[in-house]
């Protein structure tokens, strides 16, 4: 039986695979349940505000669950060449998340970001009744960062994209609403109690994930008018692609800061006193990661034996690093791939399935 896990782990399990929340791990190959009724039926362990959200806004909970899964898929993409590749296909994944290491910081940040991103996107698509497009009232004039269409004549300052020449319009992505729901559901169980360093670290990483979405939201603008007159100029806020969010958080993962708690347990300090305190966008961890080279039930390391590697690459995907110096073997395998693809009007791409033989390098 697994040891007690932090509340955030239980919540992630609930969001991603509610049918298996009692087992406290992410089940092998199980379908990820999207039905909010199933999620909330397993919500006995949720805090008051989470239970209220389940009861009052189950469709929002469904989007939060979709966003958490989006985050895990992005984690698997960004970590695909690392020794720990964010695989959720074993009980070991839950054991990894019980440690306050860099990898856990990334998982919590990317799932909080995914929850915010998914809810915000659902608002803009009209899929949630509780929200819609971003309200422009009381906001400063837009400063375009991306133009669609032909820019019009110069504005008051001599530039076609001068702020006074543009107005808010279109359907902007309401990141405020997405952040609010992500924060309400993902942060609710954490208590900033005395000595609870883990809660402080996880709350910080949650917020860093949401900030990665918000801070890379861009302003897109478009000119409207006959013959390129640009009689009307409108701008709206646009979410960044989630792949971009993942890439930004991976950069933060590489530069993550190790921290420790203050004596009263109410704040965090750099583990190395000579370093400056981490910023809001930084990821935090409190313990060193295992090397993930060999299987280890205690740490959740699945090891790298049998992993495909690149025999000629000097980076993380290379056999030297991925195989931890154990060497690798060559194996010839037969795979099926799409081939002879043709576009048929309109609008279908049809492909044949071809068998190809490839040489793979596999870790010993």
UniProtKB/Swiss-Prot annotation:
User: For the lipid attachment O-palmitoleoyl serine, which residues are annotated?
Assistant: 227
Glycosylated residues (UniProt): 85, 310
Q: Which Gene3D superfamilies match?
A: 3.30.2460.20
Q: Where in the cell is it found?
A: Secreted, Extracellular space, Extracellular matrix
Q: Where is this region: Disordered?
A: 140-162
What UniProt keywords are attached to this protein's entry?
Developmental protein, Disulfide bond, Extracellular matrix, Glycoprotein, Lipoprotein, Secreted, Signal, Wnt signaling pathway
Post-translational modification, as annotated: Palmitoleoylation is required for efficient binding to frizzled receptors. Depalmitoleoylation leads to Wnt signaling pathway inhibition.
Q: Which GO terms describe its cellular component?
A: cell surface; endoplasmic reticulum lumen; extracellular matrix; extracellular region
Domain of life of the source: Eukaryota
Record's keyword annotation contains NAD: no
Cite the PROSITE patterns for this sequence.
WNT1
Q: What is its main location?
A: secreted
Q: List the disulfide bonds.
A: 75-86, 123-131, 133-171, 221-235, 223-230, 293-324, 309-319, 323-363, 339-354, 341-351, 346-347
- A Pfam match is wnt
Q: Which SMART domains match?
A: WNT1
Which positions carry the signal peptide feature in this UniProt record? 1-23
Q: What is known about the tissue distribution of this protein? A: Detected in ileum, colon and stomach (at protein level).
Q: State a single Gene Ontology molecular function.
A: signaling receptor binding
Q: How does it assemble?
A: Interacts with PORCN.
Which family is it part of? Belongs to the Wnt family.
According to its UniProt entry, what is the function of this protein?
A: Ligand for members of the frizzled family of seven transmembrane receptors. Probable developmental protein. May be a signaling molecule which affects the development of discrete regions of tissues. Is likely to signal over only few cell diameters.
The protein depicted here goes by the name Protein Wnt-6
Primary gene name: Wnt6
């Amino acid at each position: 039986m697994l040891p007690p896990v932090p509340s955030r782990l239980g919540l992630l399990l609930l969001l991603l695979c509610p049918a298996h929340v009692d087992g406290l791990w992410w089940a092998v190959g199980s379908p990820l349940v999207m039905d909010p009724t199933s999620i909330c039926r397993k919500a006995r362990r949720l805090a008051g505000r989470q239970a209220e959200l389940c009861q009052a806004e189950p469709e929002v909970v469904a989007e939060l669950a979709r966003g958490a899964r989006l985050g895990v898929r992005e984690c698997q993409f960004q970590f695909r060449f690392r020794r720990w590749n964010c695989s959720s296909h074993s009980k070991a994944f839950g054991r990894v998340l019980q440690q306050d290491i860099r990898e856990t910081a990334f998982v919590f940040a990317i799932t909080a970001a995914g929850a915010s991103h998914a809810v915000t996107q659902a608002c803009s698509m009209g899929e949630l009744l509780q929200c819609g497009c971003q309200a422009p009232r009381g906001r400063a004039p837009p400063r375009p960062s991306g133009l669609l269409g032909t820019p019009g004549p110069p504005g008051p300052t001599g530039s076609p994209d001068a702020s006074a020449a543009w107005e808010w319009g279109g359907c902007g992505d309401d990141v405020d609403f997405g952040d609010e729901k992500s924060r309400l559901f993902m942060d609710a169980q954490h208590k900033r109690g005395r000595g609870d360093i883990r809660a402080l670290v996880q709350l910080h990483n949650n917020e860093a994930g949401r900030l990665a979405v918000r801070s890379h939201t861009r302003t897109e603008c478009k000119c409207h008018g006959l013959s390129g007159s640009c009689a009307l100029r409108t701008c709206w806020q646009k979410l960044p692609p989630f792949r971009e969010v993942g890439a930004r958080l991976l950069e933060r993962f590489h530069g993550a800061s190790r921290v420790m708690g203050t004596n009263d347990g109410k704040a965090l300090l750099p583990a190395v006193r000579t370093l400056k305190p981490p910023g809001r966008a930084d990821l935090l961890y409190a313990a060193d990661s295992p090397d993930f080279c060999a299987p280890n039930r205690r740490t959740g390391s699945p090891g790298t034996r049998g992993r495909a590697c690149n025999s000629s690459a000097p980076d993380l995907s290379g056999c030297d690093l991925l195989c931890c110096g154990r060497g690798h073997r060559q194996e010839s395998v037969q795979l099926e791939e799409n081939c002879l693809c043709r576009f048929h009007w309109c609008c279908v791409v049809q492909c044949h399935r071809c068998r190809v033989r490839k040489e793979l390098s596999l870790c010993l």
